[in-house]
Amino acid sequence: MGESPGLHPYCHGASEATATLDMIRAVREAQALGEIPGMEPDNGELFLTGYSQGGHAAMATHKYIEENNLLEEFNVIASAPCSGPYEITGAMADTILAASYSNPGYIVYIMASYQRVYGDLYTSYSDVLKAPYDEIVEPYFNGNNYTLGMGSLNEQLPQEIQSFVEDSVLENFLAASDDLSHPIWQAMAANDNHDWLPTRPIKMFYCTGDEQVSFQNALVAESTMLENGATDVEAVFKGEGMHNDCVLPSLTDAFTWFESLKTACSLSIEYLEIGDVEVFPNPIQNTFRIETEDFLNSNVSILDQSGRVVYEHQDLTPNCEIDISNLTSGCYFLMLNNVNKSITIKLIKA
């Protein structure tokens, strides 16, 4: 599941955190070497967000930074985890153990991930999964899967955990619900990230109709952190939508919150001179124009909030008009690039 080689360590906090920090270090190094033309100077402020597993990753990264005394290197101004499984042993366990769970593939995914990391959950899928499901799941998690997706796996698994997990495994797992002595419980507990004391602001966005990741994760994390002594932690209600409905309102509000907290970069005169671009109207109904002299003949790209390119245009002409009527409402980023410089401008599609 994914283009990188090997099995992705799903919801393994340490992997999520170290991969994120290594990525930031790599970008800073590339910037220092001048390998990212037109990139704004790094002012040292870090904002963390992510959705679903990305919410778990954002929380894990923030937690890792604070608990390993890395705030001097990674100055977290705020984090905004969205719809993430922060309390895996509680709110998430209650969800997947319910009478019916709409995304049973996640259950196998997390077992496969923790088996890869800890190595003590099983020796083969037949140890933990009933036939024929032990053979069905193998191609999804063999580390060489580039085409099979979670939707396909969910369609092939029953929505009742007792229908595909071996009876003895489930019985032993449930029997250890109080002391968490079962290896699967221990792996889950090692990746809970709701019970710690953040010193930097956190907002956790959630929707109450989320059928994949219980909104109780955010509420439990909020209450636990406040009990631990945190002073700036909040679970933020974003409506009654389901998991996919909650993406845009959550990430849009996270971005808006970050915008209110950031410090404007102290840009050089040279940088200000290359930023002579006018976009109007903005917010945009259907079309907008770009007026510029500095970026004529540039390549034009529009990215959504996940970084996906949703529009491309080459060779920018004077007073160019761009039609984005096919895009849904929300926040986007206009990027203009030529051989010498680049600029990014926030767009709001009404």
Kindly label every feature range from the protein language model.
Residues K203-D210:
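Short beta-strand/loop motif that positions the catalytic acidic residue
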Residues T61, R200, S214-T224:
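Short alpha-helix in the alpha/beta-hydrolase fold that links the catalytic acid
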Residues G44, L197-I202:
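Short, proline-enriched alpha-helix->beta-strand connector loops that line the catalytic pocket
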Residues A93, W185-A187, N191, Q212, ...:
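C-terminal catalytic histidine-bearing segment of alpha/beta-hydrolase fold enzymes
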Residues Y10-G34:
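Alpha/beta-hydrolase active-site loop
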